[in-house]
């Protein structure tokens, strides 16, 4: 005899599959309202399913509803206890949500725990996490520590398998350039402008199409009184595909790109000249 609950279970499984497809489709087009509606129904069907709680947290972070995101991450973390990989993944997401509300101390605590979990379980640290922790340490004014994190992240990216793929640029190479650029910015914040400029000049040779590196070079050249070099670096930044428009917006540079205060001031001084 077929159990009487079998049709109900089959119907539930079909509903979950349909809702999951709706969730993925909505998220792909950034329709967060539809995505969260699908998640609400999924969580009603499977209230203890970790992936739906994590998805809620991720989508809430993307739509900048950090209060909801943190609540979901807290619930997900409790469910994931004992699974080091899941714990690390959730804590990394929660740290990002904490950054969204400028809760630097607790974001740092979460990133520290992610890296501790990797170490105690025999895994190499994630360079993306190290770079993120560097950002948080910088926001807390701990620029020496931030610089160390950026350097470690850059080295890990650079030494990773698949760093280069023929003549093409890989995601790992982009990560290395970004981390080393952050290291150079932190070096400037610590007062070593000559050292920072030397690092940036090396990066412009390795990543000639990086508008971020070119903009940093312009700011540092201008601060050093090398005005012709500053103008040339800026023109090269503006001629890149990404362009220099974002770097004319100091709020973007400070709050989104997370340049340190000293570098924001140097860029501001250079931009004043161009007005």
Residue ranges and their predicted role:
Residues 2-51, 55:
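N-terminal leader/linker segments that initiate helical-solenoid repeat arrays
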Residues 13-14, 47, 85-87, 124-126, ...:
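Residue signature of alpha-solenoid helical repeat architecture, marking inter-repeat boundaries
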Residues 24, 58, 96, 135, ...:
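Residue-level recognition of tetratricopeptide repeat
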Residues 151-155, 211, 218, 222-246, ...:
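TPR/TPR-like (Sel1-like) alpha-helical repeat modules
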Residues 243-275:
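Terminal, low-structured helical/coil segments at or just beyond the last alpha-helical repeat
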């Amino acid at each position: 005899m077929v159990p009487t609950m079998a049709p109900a279970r089959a119907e539930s499984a079909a509903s979950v599959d349909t809702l999951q497809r709706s969730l993925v489709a909505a998220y792909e087009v950034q329709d967060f309202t539809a995505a969260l509606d699908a998640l609400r129904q999924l969580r009603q069907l499977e209230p203890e399913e970790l992936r739906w709680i994590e998805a809620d947290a991720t989508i809430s972070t993307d739509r900048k509803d950090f209060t909801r995101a943190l609540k979901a991450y807290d619930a997900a973390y409790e469910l994931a206890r004992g699974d080091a990989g899941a714990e690390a993944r959730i804590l990394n997401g929660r740290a990002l949500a904490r950054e969204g509300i400028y809760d630097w101390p607790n974001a740092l605590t979460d990133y520290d725990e992610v890296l501790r979990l990797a170490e105690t379980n025999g895994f190499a640290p994630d360079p993306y996490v190290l770079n993120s922790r560097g950002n948080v340490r910088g926001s807390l004014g701990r620029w020496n520590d931030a610089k160390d994190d950026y350097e470690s992240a850059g080295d890990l990216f650079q030494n990773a398998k698949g760093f280069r793929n023929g003549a093409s640029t890989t995601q790992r190479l982009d990560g290395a350039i970004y981390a080393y650029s952050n290291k150079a910015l932190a070096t400037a914040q610590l007062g070593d402008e000559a050292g920072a400029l030397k690092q940036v000049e090396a990066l412009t040779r390795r990543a000639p199409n990086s508008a971020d590196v070119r903009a940093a070079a312009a700011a540092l050249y201008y601060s050093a009184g090398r005005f012709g070099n500053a103008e040339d670096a800026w023109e090269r930044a503006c001629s890149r595909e990404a362009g220099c428009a974002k770097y004319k917006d100091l709020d973007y540079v400070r709050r989104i790109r997370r340049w340190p205060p000293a570098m924001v001031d140097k860029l501001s001084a250079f931009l004043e000249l161009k007005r």
